[in-house]
């Protein structure tokens, strides 16, 4: 049944050794997608990314072959590339979770040139966010809010690392992500207002802003916030009103609040325009 697959059962295999390095983020151009859901999303939505190898866990694949309507088996059968089967002990060395689902894709994410950025359309700019869980949640939130562009500064955690991918739950493939961007240069090229989250005396309340129009949101590092050089070029600084008992919000939580306040205002404007026609 698996005659088209290559079986690897030795830790000394050159391809397996390379996979280990990639799993440790030692090759920036490649990454591993782990789990059925992520791999399905890649096949359905990936734009410009390349599938380099499809890797299956030996025992999981054997079990799936004897199950009706197995998602793992369906994934195996829809591939246009010859799969690789890893012995269980080798497969688990590549996994970032204790209970793997039996499939990993080796992919080369699309590297988007900055000239593809739509400088007059809403986007989120991320300045040196370090926590993978935070970045993954931001990516997922941006996609859920209907925003299509995310720009990551140099010094931001790798967008395609295993923990970021797991937190984002496939949202990478719903938006366009630009990485390693010099924000001090980019912000001068944007043709829309730039709102930076900050807690300064000059900051304006989120709920006092008209957010129905296009804008750029600027989110900063967990401890340091937005860098001074970039912050100085923002149109306005914005804060989220909150109880005094807490000094500040987590950056990913703040991202969700501001993006969905903008979405609420836009939907309200659309509803007003629609019902105002009568």
Features from the language model and the residues they span:
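Active-site/ligand-binding-proximal alpha/beta "capping" segment
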Residues: 196-246
């Amino acid at each position: 049944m698996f005659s088209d697959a290559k079986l690897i059962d030795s830790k000394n295999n050159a391809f397996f050794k390379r996979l280990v390095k990639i799993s440790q983020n030692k090759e920036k151009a490649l990454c591993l997608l782990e789990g059925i859901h992520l791999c399905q999303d890649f096949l359905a939505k990936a734009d410009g990314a390349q599938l380099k190898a499809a890797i299956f866990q030996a025992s999981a694949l054997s079990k799936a072959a004897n199950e009706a309507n197995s998602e793992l088996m369906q994934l195996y059968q829809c591939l246009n590339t010859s799969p690789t089967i890893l012995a269980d002990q080798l497969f688990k060395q590549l996994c970032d979770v204790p209970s793997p689902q039996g499939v990993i894709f080796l992919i080369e994410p699309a590297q988007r040139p900055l000239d593809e950025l739509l400088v007059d359309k809403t986007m989120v700019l991320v300045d040196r966010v370090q926590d993978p869980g935070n970045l993954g949640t931001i990516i997922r939130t941006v996609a859920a809010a209907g925003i299509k562009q995310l720009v990551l500064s140099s010094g931001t955690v790798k967008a395609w690392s295993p923990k970021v991918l797991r937190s984002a739950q496939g949202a990478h493939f719903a938006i366009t992500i630009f990485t390693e961007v010099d924000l001090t240069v980019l912000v001068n090229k944007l043709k829309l207002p730039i709102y930076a989250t900050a807690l300064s005396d000059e900051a304006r309340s989120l709920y006092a802003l008209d957010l129905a129009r296009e804008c750029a949101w600027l989110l900063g590092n967990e401890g340091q916030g937005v860098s001074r050089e970039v912050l100085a070029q923002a149109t306005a600084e914005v804060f989220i009103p909150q109880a005094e008992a807490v000094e500040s919000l987590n950056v990913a939580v703040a991202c969700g609040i501001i993006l969905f306040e903008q979405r609420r205002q836009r939907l309200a404007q659309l509803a007003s325009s629609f019902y105002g026609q009568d």
